[in-house]
Amino acid sequence: MAALGSPARTLRGLLRELRYLNAATGRPYRDTAAYRYLVKAFRAHRVTSEKLCRAQHELHFQAATYLCLLSSIRQHVALHQEFHGKGERSVEESAGLVGLQLPRQPGGKGWEP
């Protein structure tokens, strides 16, 4: 994983992913327990003045990891929907995908050479 960046940027990214997840339900993402938990945790681990705290770094790392997971899942679902196979294809459809046509019998049904 690359550099973490600022905690505010990570929080904004997590909230953006929450918005994507709640878009299907139609409910505002601010009404979810996940939103309240994230905001509460980031406010509780805010660094004041020159004080550095290990818990804040751990929270930021876990949040950045979770953000990476959520965005990767969303991208995977989008790619899967776009390129998912349609099941078993017939021989004619498979030939058409590569630009070929199957030969046709000149005499129709029951034709013998």
Curated annotation (Swiss-Prot):
This entry carries the following GO cellular component terms, namely: mitochondrion
GO terms classed as biological process: apoptotic mitochondrial changes; dopaminergic neuron differentiation; mitochondrial proton-transporting ATP synthase complex assembly; mitochondrion organization; motor behavior; negative regulation of lipid catabolic process; regulation of type B pancreatic cell proliferation; response to toxic substance
Pfam families named in the record: Complex1_LYR_2 (PF13233)
Chief location bin: mitochondrion
Region Disordered, annotated ranges: 90-113
Q: Where does the UniProt annotation locate this protein?
A: Mitochondrion
Record keywords:
Mitochondrion
The subunit structure is: Interacts with ATPAF2.
Q: Which family does it belong to?
A: Belongs to the FMC1 family.
Q: What does this protein do?
A: Plays a role in the assembly/stability of the mitochondrial membrane ATP synthase (F(1)F(0) ATP synthase or Complex V).
Tell me the protein's name: Protein FMC1 homolog
Organism field: Mus musculus
